[in-house]
């Protein structure tokens, strides 16, 4: 039987309830469907109770508010299950938070609001979006009537920011965004609510390809980036940071011509040549074959060491491939060309035999100039 009463006191194990002049006992476990420590908000109000025990001889009455709530919830639950449809919007109370989402009480039925369906932007923890006790409106994404499982969405209440994003941000567009996350391979930049793009580490700096993102930007920084590529289907945007800065390779190409003299310090020496540091933080390569006219590259390179100041001539600039070819020997005249200019065809010359093979002999005519004497001509 359901009766109306008022909670008017606290006793061991529960509370006292006045039922039209009759004193009843309300066990603490039967106040609500969930444990209630503080009943201040309930005291003094007329509430519905169900009599679960009545002993007239001992004048002992035990009531339950929980039974009334469960009965009402059951009716509400049945009605909700009957009317619930995928795609509809419903209101609910956030009941519990987990690392993967939030459980929402829709009225006798709990639905899961997964963390990936809370917002279009990256969410690290559900508490960033909702809190226990919040009343929220959600959309029913999936409803398994047999298993009574409901999947809910919050972000689906708004428009998907990825729709037609390529039209809003064509390749080459420059825009500002906020750095939201750093990884070893780059940084993520939010260019609008719910849309993040990746700036790969190779697109951060023109001259340092292996720099760690933390050396360039910090989380929270507002930066200018360029849209390099958009894959709407996979929801991926490639962004560039360095493209919003002047390209030192292009600048060098615009200010230097083939044959120009440049100077710099040796940054490194490898098996194939010498790298020279140039203005703008870029490097140029002197190949072994371009070190000396007279000495083999492997021997000539031994005359140099890292840190040496060195001059060279610009041989070729490929700004697109970020390559600059330099030459040291080109600072001096080519002895071969000089020899040809001074020696006419048919002239008799002298030389020193430096090598002999089955087909003939190699003859040094002058420093840096060799000729080959075939055996048939000897």
Swiss-Prot record:
Keyword Calcium set for record: no
Keyword list, A-Z: Repeat, Ribonucleoprotein, Ribosomal protein, RNA-binding
Keyword GTP-binding: no
GO biological process: translation
Domain S1 motif, chain residue ranges per copy: 1-66, 87-155, 172-242, 259-329, 346-378
SUPFAM superfamilies: Nucleic acid-binding proteins
Superkingdom per UniProt: Bacteria
InterPro entries: NA-bd_OB-fold (IPR012340), Ribos_protein_bS1-like (IPR050437), Ribosomal_bS1 (IPR000110), Ribosomal_protein_S1-like (IPR035104), S1_domain (IPR003029)
A molecular-function term among this protein's GO annotations: mRNA binding
Function in brief: Binds mRNA; thus facilitating recognition of the initiation point. It is needed to translate mRNA with a short Shine-Dalgarno (SD) purine-rich sequence.
Family statement drawn from the similarity comment of this UniProt entry: Belongs to the bacterial ribosomal protein bS1 family.
Name the record gives this protein: Small ribosomal subunit protein bS1
Gene of this entry: rpsA
């Amino acid at each position: 039987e359901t009766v109306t009463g008022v909670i008017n006191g606290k006793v061991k194990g529960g509370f006292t309830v006045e039922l039209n002049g009759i004193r009843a006992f309300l066990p603490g476990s039967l106040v609500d469907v969930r444990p209630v420590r503080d009943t201040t908000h309930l005291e003094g109000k007329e509430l519905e109770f169900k009599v679960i025990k009545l002993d007239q001889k001992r004048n002992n009455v035990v009531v339950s508010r929980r039974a009334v709530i469960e009965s009402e919830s059951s009716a509400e639950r049945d009605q909700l299950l009957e009317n619930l449809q995928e795609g509809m919007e419903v209101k609910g109370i956030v009941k519990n938070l987990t690392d993967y989402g939030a459980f929402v009480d829709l009225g006798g039925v709990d639905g899961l609001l997964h963390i990936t369906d809370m917002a279009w932007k990256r969410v690290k923890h559900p508490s960033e979006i909702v809190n226990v006790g919040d009343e929220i409106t959600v959309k029913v994404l999936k409803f398994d009537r047999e298993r009574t499982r409901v999947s809910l969405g919050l972000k689906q209440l708004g428009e998907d920011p990825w729709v037609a994003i390529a039209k809003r941000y064509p390749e080459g567009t420059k825009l500002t965004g906020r750095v939201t996350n750093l990884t070893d391979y780059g940084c993520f930049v939010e260019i609008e609510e719910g849309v993040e793009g990746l700036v790969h580490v190779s697109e951060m700096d023109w001259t340092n390809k292996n720099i760690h993102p933390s050396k360039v930007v910090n989380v929270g920084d507002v930066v200018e980036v360029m849209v390099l590529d958009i894959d709407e289907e996979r929801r991926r945007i490639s962004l560039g940071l360095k493209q919003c800065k002047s390209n030192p390779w292009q600048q060098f190409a615009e200010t230097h011509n083939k044959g120009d003299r440049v100077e710099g310090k040796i940054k490194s020496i490898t098996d194939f040549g010498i790298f020279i540091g140039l203005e703008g933080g870029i490097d140029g390569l002197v190949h072994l074959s371009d070190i000396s006219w007279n000495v083999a590259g492997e021997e000539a390179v031994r005359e140099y060491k890292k840190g040496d100041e060195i001059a060279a001539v610009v041989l070729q600039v490929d700004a697109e491939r970020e390559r600059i070819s330099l030459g040291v020997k080109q600072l001096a005249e080519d002895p071969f060309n000089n020899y040809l200019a001074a020696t006419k065809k048919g002239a008799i010359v002298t030389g020193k035999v430096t090598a002999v093979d089955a087909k003939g002999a190699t003859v040094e005519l002058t420093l840096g100039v060799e000729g080959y004497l075939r055996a048939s001509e000897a």
